[in-house]
């Protein structure tokens, strides 16, 4: 999966480790959300699977960044000049605090070494999107997106059609 734009120098790609095709990429910035053993029919062992992710981290361009979930046991092997950050829901270099969930809405304060942003509202109020949002906001900040643009983007993001859609939202349902 990828997102291309005629007016942006950035491309967003959901990389796939299935057949090691992510080894063909040379990202400037990357997020690794999980390394749960998968595709062992291809990799053979959990160790080989993790080694494939370690190799992927060597492909990040100097001057870029790796944002890796803090619970991942992977030891990245980045090139000189690549910054490595951690993230998670409530811990890490990038994380959420003051999480408020209720009435079909989620708000939180985004904590970042690049500058905090208060009162983030999720457009798709599903708890896992707190963590996903933290990683997305980290990439956005590193790309020069303003705090106001980040807040608006998080609030208006609607996700994939037909996933977690509200059909009715009132006090009775």
Spans of model-derived segments:
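Extended acidic/charged loop-beta regions that coordinate divalent cations
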Residues: 2-38, 76-119, 160-170
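Substrate-engagement module of ASCE P-loop NTPases
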Residues: 52-60
């Amino acid at each position: 999966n990828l997102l291309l734009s005629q007016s942006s120098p950035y491309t967003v790609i959901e990389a796939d480790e299935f057949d090691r095709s992510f080894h063909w990429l040379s990202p400037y910035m990357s997020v690794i959300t999980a390394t749960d053993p998968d595709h062992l029919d291809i990799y053979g062992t959990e160790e080989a699977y993790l080694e494939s992710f370690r190799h992927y981290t060597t492909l990040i361009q100097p001057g870029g960044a790796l944002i890796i979930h803090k619970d991942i046991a992977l030891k990245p092997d980045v090139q000189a000049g690549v910054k490595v950050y951690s993230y998670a829901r409530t811990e890490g270099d990038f994380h959420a605090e003051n999480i408020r969930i209720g009435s079909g809405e989620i708000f939180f304060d985004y904590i970042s070494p690049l500058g905090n942003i208060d009162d983030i509202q999720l457009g798709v109020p599903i708890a896992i999107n707190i963590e996903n949002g933290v990683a997305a906001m980290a990439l956005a900040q590193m790309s020069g997106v303003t705090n106001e643009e980040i807040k608006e983007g998080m609030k208006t993001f609607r996700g994939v059609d037909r996933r977690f859609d509200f059909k009715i939202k009132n006090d009775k349902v």
